Each structure stands twice: as C-alpha cells, then as structure tokens.
Amino acid sequence: MLLKKKRYMFDERDDNNINSPVAVEPSSNNNKMADTREVRIEEQLKVKIGEAKNLSSRNAANTSCSTQGTRDVYCTIALDQEEICRTPTIERTLTPFFGEEHQFKIPRRFRYLTIYLWDRDMKQDKPIGKIAIKREELHMYNHKDHWFSLRPVDQDSEVQGMVNVEVAFTEAQQTQSLSEGIDLGQHTLRHHQNLPHHSHQQRAHLNDYKENSELSNIQRASAAAASSSSAAMTLKTRAAGLFGHVHHPPSQTQHFPIINTTSTSSDQLSNWKSHGRFVGVTIKVPACVDLAKKQGTCDPFVVCTAHYSNKHQVTRRTKQRKKTVDPEFDEAMYFDLHIDADAGSTNTTGSNKSAGSLESSANKGYSIYPVGGADLVEIVVSVWHDAHGAMSDKVFLGEVRLPMLNKQEQQAVNPSAWYYLQPRSMTHSSRSLNATPRSCATPPGTRLSVDSTIGSLRLNLNYTADHVFPLATYDDLMNLLLESVDQRPITVSAVSILGELVSGKTEVAQPLVRLFTHTERIAPIIKALADHEISHLTDPTTIFRGNTLVSKMMDEAMRLSGLHYLHQTLRPVLSQIVAEKKPCEIDPSKIKDRSAVDTNLHNLQDYVERVFEAITKSADRCPKVLCQIFHDLRECAGEHFPSNREVRYSVVSGFIFLRFFAPAILGPKLFDLTTERLDAQTSRTLTLISKTIQSLGNLVSSRSSQQTCKEEFTVELYKKFCTEQHVDAVKHFLEVISTPSHASSSVHPAAAAATPLEPVLLKEGLMTKYPTSRKRFGRQFKQRHFRLTTHSLSYAKSKGKQPICDIPLQEIASVEQLKDKSFKMQNCFKIVHNDRSLIVQTTNCVEEREWFDLLHKICLMNSIRMQYFHPSAFVSGFYSCCGRSDENSPGCKKVLDKTMDYFQMDLVTALDPALDLQRIHTLIMSNMSVLESLLDPLTYHQSLSQTQHQQHNPLVPLATDLQKHSPQAFAEFKRTIEKLREKAYAIDRDHRDYKQGITRQLKYGSRQAPIGDDNYWHMMRAAGQLNQQHHQQQQHQQQQQQQQQQQLQQFQPQPVLPQMQNVRAYPYQPATSNMNAYCLHNMQYQQQRLPFHQQQQQHHQQLQQQQSQFQPLRSHQLQRHNNNLNNNNCGNGSSSSPSSTTSSVVAAPPSTTSSSQPAPPIY
C-alpha cells in the first residue's frame, strides 16, 4: 500500500519521557520519509544478577583481618538513582549467590543503569559498592555473563539531573567621559574605569541573600578592607595624576592598559574598543530537572563560585526551594571578569591568614599575579541540598564548570544551554568542562576488571530499544509473514526461514506468537510447523524435546494466552505454601534430625496433592486457543504414529506439564504468581513439588504406571502418586483440554479467558493514596495495599486485611497522570470514579507505568469514560492547573484520545503488532549478511565446498536439501528470501531518513541533547554512518554483481579458435582410448590442398555463414562438454594448440551415447 511520508523531529511532551520524538508536518521541500503521526521508543531491560565475590568483611580494618566476619548482602537495581527492584538478603556470607532475574519496561529517559550492593545493618543499610553502566553501552553486554568491579559510593559520585544555565556578558559603558579621559590624561581615564567596577560590585551585593552563610566574618571583613583600599588607591592615583606622575605598586596595577597621551585620539579610541569589551558576566539558572533525592527529599539551591587567576573566589547563591527535584530559580548573579590586584590578596574561601601576612604575600617579588589585576578563570555552578538536622548542613548534588579565561572561551559559552550535572572534581586544578568522568562500568578482561579492592559482581544483561513506526509502515512485512500459514512446504515460508536464521529461538518466537495471536492465526501456524517437525521423527519419545522454533512458540503461546489461567489455577495454593513455610525436605543428607523425615514427607505429600487437584480440576477454564493448539498437536502425532496410543497424551503433557505448570511452580516470581521473597526452605519445597508434578505428567507416556525413581529418598513419595487413579485423572485432564469447543470459532482466541468464573488478580502492591474529596485533619497521605482484579480495584491497610474501599471497574471514569508540581512529588496519577477522585503515588516510575496502563485500558472499555479532567490537584481551595475554586467543576484538559486500532484492548493480553514487527525487522537486519550470501552464487558455492561456512550460515543445509529434492521448492525458497530482503531494506530506509531528520533538527545544548555527555556526538556519528553504510551496501551489491558476472564468464566457453569451429565434443566412453575425443567434419584434406591465403578467405566466409546457425548449438555442446569434464576425474589432460590441432584430433564413433545429464546449476 502507498504510504504518505512525513518528517520526524524531537518534541517535548507532557509525559516523563522528554526524548519522545513525534512527527510534524513536512517542510516545503518534498523529502519523503516514513509515515505519519508518531514514532515511539520502546525500551526493555532484563537483568540477571548472579553472584558476588571478593567482598571485604564488615570489621576488616586491615588486610590481616579481612577474612574475619561476614555480611548480610542484597542488591538493588536503579535507573540513575531511582530504585526499581531488589533481591532477597543473603545472610552471613562474603560470596553471596543471588540467582535473581528481573525484567521490566523502561518508561522514562535515563543516563545510567545502576546496581547497588548493600550491607544490611541493624541501624542503617550501608552501600558496599555500585556498578553504573551508561545507557549507550548496555547493548555491549547483551546475552553474556560479565564480571563488573564494584566502585565506591560517595556523595560526589551520586549525581544525576540537568541544569539550564543562562550566561550574559556586560559590555563597558562608552559615554562621553571616554573622550574626556583621553584629553585630560591618564588619571581621568582610570577614574572612569573604576566607576563600572564599583557599580557592578554594588549590584553583586544585592544578590547576596541573608541565608548566604558561606562567607564567614573574617571573609566579610577582608572583603570590606579590600573595597576600602581600592577606594583609597583611586583617590591616591587621582591626586598623583594631577602632579604629573603616578606610582604603581605591584599589587595595585590596573587591569586596563595605560593609554599613552602622546598618541592620537583615534588610536586611543580603537585601543579602548578592542581591549576589555566585556567587564562582567551574569549567571542565571532558570530551572533544574530530575535532581537526586537525599533521604527521600530534595531542598535544592544553587551556588555560583567565580575562580580568578590569583586564586581569589567570589561566591553567590540562590534561595532554597522546598521539596522538589525540578526547581526553578529567578535570581541573577553578577561577577566581574577582571578584578584589582589588591582584591587578589583577599581569599573568600575561608583562609585564616592575618592582614599582615596577606599584605606581605602580595608584595613578594616572585608574584605570579597578572600585571594589572586578576582575570576570571572559570565559574562553577553547583547544586546543593539543604539537609536540615543532619551532620552536614548541605549535600552536593552536582556541578557544571564554565571556562572564562580568555575571549575565545567566553565566546564559546552558550548563552542559554542545558548541561548534565557532573561529579565534583577531585582536585581544584581540574578546570576542563569537557572532561568526562570515569565510567564505573568495567568490561571484562581489562586491567580495571581486576583492579578492585571492594569486590566484583556477575551480571547478565539484555537491553533492547526499538524505534516503533506506525503499523502501516510494516504492512508488507506482516503480509509476507502471514502468507506462511498457507505455504507448502512450510520450510520455504518466511516464518520457517526466520526460525532457522536466528540462533536464539526465543527472540524470534516471542514476536511471532504475539503477531499471529493478534491476527487470530496462531493455531494454524503452529500446526503447520509441528506437522513438519513430527514427520521427520522416528522415535515418538523425542517429540518436541529440543529447543526448536515450534517448541519455543508453544512456550510463548501458553504464557501469553494462558497466563491468567495459570494464576487462577496455582496462585491460591502457592500462596498457602509460601505463607505456611512448612519444612518438606526428605533428603536424609540435608537434614540433621533424621526423625523429621516422616513429618516432612507428610507435609510434602499434602502440598503435592493440593497442587495436583488444582491442576486436574481446572480443565474447564483452559483458554480455547490453547485447546485448539493441543487438539492439532494430538491429531498430528496420532497421524504419524498410529500404532502408539500413548503419543496422543505425551505430546500434550510434554507442553502443559513439563513446559508450563512445572516451571511455574519452580519459579513463581517469573510467572508473576507471587511477589514475596522466597527463602531457601520455601524454594526447596517448590523444587520438590515441581519434580513430582513433572513425573506425574510423564506417567501417560509410559506403558506401566510404575516409574523408575532417580533418587532413593523419592521412592515413598512416588508410591503414593504413581497409581492408576492419578494416571486416569491426568488422561482425563489431557482429553478435556485437547478437545476444542464448537463455539470457539466465533470467539477471539486471545479473549477466551476474559470471562473467568472468579475474579483474576491482575496486579497488587503498596501505594500511597491521597483522597481529595474528604475534609479531614492530620496526614492525608497514607500507604495502602492495592489489589486490581477483573472485577474491582480495592485497597486495605495491609495485605490480607479487609478492604477499606472497593471500587467496581465499571465506575472508573478516568485515569490520568498528574503534574509533578501539584504535590511536589513524582510518580502520581489520578483515578476518578463517581464524581470523586483518588490520587495515588507509586514507589517508582516502572510501577507507575504498569498501574497506569492497566487502569487506562479499563477506562477505554468503560462507557462512562470522562472526556475532560484536571491535570493538577485540588489544593488550598482551588485547582492549581486552572485556578477554579469549585472542586466539582468540569475538567480543563481533554483526555488523551489514543487511537488503539492496532492494540487488542482486553484484560488478558495487550498486543502491540507494530512493536513485534519492528523486533522482527531488527532480527532480519542483524542477519542480513546470511540472507544475502544465499543469493550470491559465488558465496553459496564456497559455503557448499567448505564445511566451516555451514556453521556460520544455518540456512545452507536447508537450501541444499531443497535443491536436491525439489527444485521448485528451492526456487520458492529463494523468492521468499528476496522478498524478506526487499521489505527489510524498505523499512530500514524509513529508519535512516527518520534518524537523519532528527539529527538535522537537534541542537547541541538543548534539553534533548544537553552539554556534558557524548550522546549528541554519538547520534551525529551514527547519522553519518547511516549514509556511509548505505553507500557501502550499494557498493557491496555492485561488487557482488561484478563478481557474479566474472564468475559466469569463467564458466562460459572461451572464444573458439578458427581451427575448432566445426569440432563437436562427445563424452568419454570406456572403449575409447582418448578421453578428449573430437570429431572433425571433412576439414583436414581441404586445409592440406588449398593455398594458405585461399584457406583464410574460405574460412572467413564460412565463419560468417555458420555463425548464426551453429552458435546456439556450439554453446550447448561446449557447456555439456565442460560438465562432462567436471564429472569425469580421469584423462590425459592434454590440450590442442592451433598448430597441432589436425594431428591431435581423433574421430569418435557416431554411435556414441551421452552420459546421464548432471544436476542443473543454481543459476
């Protein structure tokens, strides 16, 4: 389909993600780009925390006692410094093993992924160390385990956020006093030069507020002394100038040059204009964004410090802002670019020197102060938190350094720009603004990876960031994938090719399952893939035992469509097991008291019986789409193995028990079955239950009900459950779930479980509520335990208590995000129901995103959904957004009308086909070289001749098999690959144009590309590399075409010699002594009788006559001869030259028959 192209650009939006690009109308030029309204960035992160090693003990004061004592250790995962999740505490160890896996979507912009390692203490938990990895570097560690060195956590390293700094330079006032000063003399000029200085100094004092306690009494006294001495020197200089001479001590020289009275006035005026144009600079910090919190709060203020070349410092600060991480300041702070030399003797940093020592140090002969005064070197803009009641009255939040040493640096400063806050410099000599801080992420194998005195932590990361275009952009690719359902054989389809192309089957299975579930064709595609896989098996016990594409797609389909069925079945019984914490260990080697084995066995049998009963009685609640898939698998297995009746059960139990129920019992947190932290005893209990349930599922595949036990201590356990009664219950369960209903054809497969018999728990957790409708005294923010089910939203004082409030889902009218300035708190949203509102705050941004998405989908389904709302809270008798005093007044902002055409809005699944298609496109582009190698004949022949290439190209065995058995299927296989390449390159062009458009419109120093990080330069470099890669791809394709032509020319016959024009080649026969047997038609006697020149004329005429007649025949004959030479490995290997052709040719018998025709070439 034809798509209208538009240009994309960055635009700041109301939500937290300021890096969200949106499309705007194209400009006057007709540049075509990918379609339409919006391009969104979907980021997802999976973190596996393994183990830590080489941790120092808590009481380790030196190396000798470093092995004494242990720690209680746990980890937290944070985006910048906002904690997202944490691991359980591993007690009394220095080598903790966590084995935790956390996966979540990233809802906002961040700079660093930070993993903290904590030591739990009675008083306060203390950080042992941390790992900070830049967002741009996360992809370097995907899918592999890496050891990272822990870095110390201090106040200077805990920096985050941005600051907006405005810089304005003040020019010297050039009035009529300038010419008067030139005529009257040197003293008058200096008098007028000192006037701006004192006026600006007076303005600077106005910005010094009462709460500015940085200057001590000594500093104030020294500053006053410097001011009075400067005034005295002005009078002294004026008086001396009247008598014709001026004496300048070294410490009192002026910073402006002395104008010679003997020169002309025009020269003096030009020197004045070219020298010292700027006399001061004004710094203003309008806003800061996303500052770090200290002890859960932030009361920021800004301090500006001017550093001069004589080590003099001038400090200004703003007023404090209360309880906000996004403060705004309106103060302007003024600093002189040049100060007098005597001012350099006063140090405002709090030195304890006396006045005499300062004067003596200023009059030393080896002073390094500049002649004429001191220049401004740099201005440090730092942000601080006012911690009242703490040991330190202020906490460092970050700083920005602005160089001001010379005119070049002053002109390089952006008048208004955003800066990333940087850690505090370790030494005062570090004055470089562009100096990047040392990264805390340490790749393995480097010198820094072993240079760690704190310890190391093993992590496995998987970070994905997809730029998702509107669904219309992927229409061609989606249609190509959907055609796979009807293609036969299935191996020539796009889905099968992707399964063989990508090594990680889970990466390609997940988007494929979600895409085909959205189009209601998941059952047919799994049936086609399963039928092809089962047809190539000879042993029924190995069905779906490997990690093939169809096995992974079945795993994803069960988890996608059957997740809430799993919650209904196992959540109640698992909650009891976690809460009761009964010991169930039956291994004698792991129990100190052997008499407790019988009691533990009884507890374990009771738990297994509960779980088994919950599973077998849940067959009626199995989703219809899963019933249809199980039915198709059973029919395919019965068709290929008709003599084996057990295979009809084992093919279903292999998925539902071995790949669904057993893994969910073993790891309930991975399937969202519980949010509790499991201790070692509970984990061991769940492991034993999972093994038993898996063994019960295997009973239907064996001909006897007694199964061999792998461990001796499980004999008594299996005796109770390996009975005919349990086997019949399992078979009945499998029969029911593999029998589809007749009404399933009219019901959406993904929405089959949307009407459960009892409420399904969607989400629960702790949140802070603020009821705006009630008028009460005291604290209104209260922490409550919220539960969201398919029926209602409720909250109670704690988990398990009676709900205080229960809101039916039908009564929820609107859910919208709030501005952070309403309560000066983050992660808040408003729930409106029955003309009342409830404001809720979550613990972090990820929780806010999950709760908001679920409630927003419910509101989209409600008929009473509101159209307008108030984006702010009703505080102090009015709405801060619109100023209305009536609490029941209609909203002032329209509810976001998000078109969810390509989203399936139900409570079971929320599918996003555009995101899934983008992930598939990313997989295709990452493996494009493998696809193109199959379309290149030269590379394909090399991969066939060398076995090493088959390991790098997984499609070569499939292509060889298709070429051998079915040339038509092989041709269809090539056409599918060409279509995949064509569709992928079309989408890639849209991505390239989009990124180039962003790069052209992005400004360095804006809020989207702040100064102080290399993100902008990475983007610029990436945009340049996109063009370069595009040109390289075109050049590579041209080179491949040239190589193909050269290769084909080598295979084509060489120009035939004049003596060989009528030579016909015949294949080798065993009866013939000469392999190169040619037949020459009556040419020898004519060449012997005719003169040489007549032979040439006659030969030339014959060539012209026979060229059009024998050219096709000659080409066919010579090609068949070359093929025969390749098929026959014996012979003389002799060649005929033009002079010896007549003597080397031997006539072949005309009755010779040709050999079997070889296989046709690929191209």
Curated annotation (Swiss-Prot):
One annotated Gene Ontology cellular component of this protein: plasma membrane
Region (Disordered): 1026-1051, 1091-1163
Tissue: In third instar larvae eye imaginal disk, expressed in cells posterior to the morphogenetic furrow, in all photoreceptor and cone cell precursors as well as in still uncommitted cells.
Any one GO biological process: anterior/posterior axis specification, embryo
Domain C2: residue ranges: 26-148, 261-419
Pfam families: BTK, C2, PH, RasGAP
SMART domains: BTK, C2, PH, RasGAP
Domain PH: 762-860
Domain of life: Eukaryota
Keywords, alphabetical: GTPase activation, Metal-binding, Repeat, Zinc, Zinc-finger
Name this protein carries in UniProt: GTPase-activating protein
Binding locations of Zn(2+): 870, 881-882, 892
